[in-house]
Amino acid sequence: IYIFSGIQKMNSSFVPDTFEWMISAFDTVLSKRQLGIVTKFGYVIPYFELSIGVLLLVKQFRFIVVPLVILMHILILIMLGPTGKSYNSVVWPWNIIMIALILLLFADVKQERFFDISFLFKGLSFYIVITLMLIFPIFSLNNQYDSYLSSSLYSSNLNECQLILTDKAYKRLPNDLKAFCTTNVDHNVLYIKKWVEEELNVPCVPEYRIFRNAHHYIIQLTQTDSKEVKFNFIEREKLIEF
């Protein structure tokens, strides 16, 4: 998780779009100058996460890495939790569970769980985990696999989608959905991500099929067609071409 989470953050949008927004939770306790210094640290975050993912595998470094990982999750909870942005309520228990797993798996392990490494290769579950957590996420770097299933967490590099509505379709929208639209003389735009975040307080799954389902739903809701509700899909940056 940490290895791919770090790799996914190696893009030009992470610091200005996500990291600066997250650390703004401290704007009441830090000065602008201090926030500026912390912002520069954001460029190190991808490599920091990648490193801790690797170093957790090395027993000799765990006494340093485990406290750093726990501190990272605590800071994330402070920034995104009720005391900070109060955003994405799903991620609050997720961070607590990650701390518990780190302590369970890597802290103060005095005896190896398996004396013979070949024991791992005898179970089907080992190959399932390797496939889901190591092989499939590689394809996400070329946008051929789901971002969230590849630890692309707060990476700022996600697919985007807008539904562009004619005046006819816009007028048929319920008032609660109009709140998630911007309007001007030329067109009306419904932001699916904003809609999901406001109603559920969790991010939208940023995949083509999800956006298409929302597109079809709006067409049915407004009793129009794809000419009245246009689908504008913006693919995320591919970190690797293959």
Model-derived features: positions:
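Functionalized membrane-embedded alpha-helices
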Residues: I1-M10, V38-M79, I102-L105, S151
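Transmembrane alpha-helix/helix-exit interface in multi-pass inner-membrane proteins
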Residues: I1-M22, Q144
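Hydrophobic alpha-helical transmembrane segments in integral membrane proteins
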Residues: Q8-S13, L134-L158
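Short aromatic-rich membrane-water interface segments that cap or initiate transmembrane helices
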Residues: D27-F41
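Membrane-interface junctions at the ends of membrane-embedded or membrane-associated helices
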Residues: Q60-R62, L105-L120
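Loop-to-transmembrane alpha-helix initiation sites
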Residues: G84-L101
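Internal/C-terminal transmembrane anchor helices
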Residues: I117-N143
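Extracytosolic and intramembrane catalytic regions of membrane-associated proteins
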Residues: L153-F242
